[in-house]
Amino acid sequence: MANHKSAIKRHRQNLLARARNRAVKTRVRNVIKAVRAALIGGDAAAAETALLTATKVLDKAATKKIIHWKTAARNISRLSTAVNKAKSA
């Protein structure tokens, strides 16, 4: 454990940030799973609405620098491609 006052504060702030980041990353994983589940279920309309939510969540996480912006862009691109294929099929 830290001994200096500033190090104690830094540790406390890190714990709070970690909790916040974990919550956001969990949400990101869950919305991606929701899109994939809708695609597997064959429901293109549900997949499209889930994609809108996923896009919003991924962009917000990237804006807050919780995930890298290129990771967010890659995930959105791949999910969009999959949803578009499901709609056209």
UniProtKB/Swiss-Prot annotation:
Keywords: Ribonucleoprotein, Ribosomal protein, RNA-binding, rRNA-binding. Pfam families: Ribosomal_S20p. Coiled coil: none annotated. One of its GO terms (molecular function) is small ribosomal subunit rRNA binding. One of its GO terms (cellular component) is cytosol. GO terms for biological process: translation. It comes from the Bacteria. The keyword Ribosomal protein applies. The keyword Ribosomal protein applies. InterPro entries: Ribosomal_bS20, Ribosomal_bS20_sf. Belongs to the bacterial ribosomal protein bS20 family. Binds directly to 16S ribosomal RNA. This is Small ribosomal subunit protein bS20.
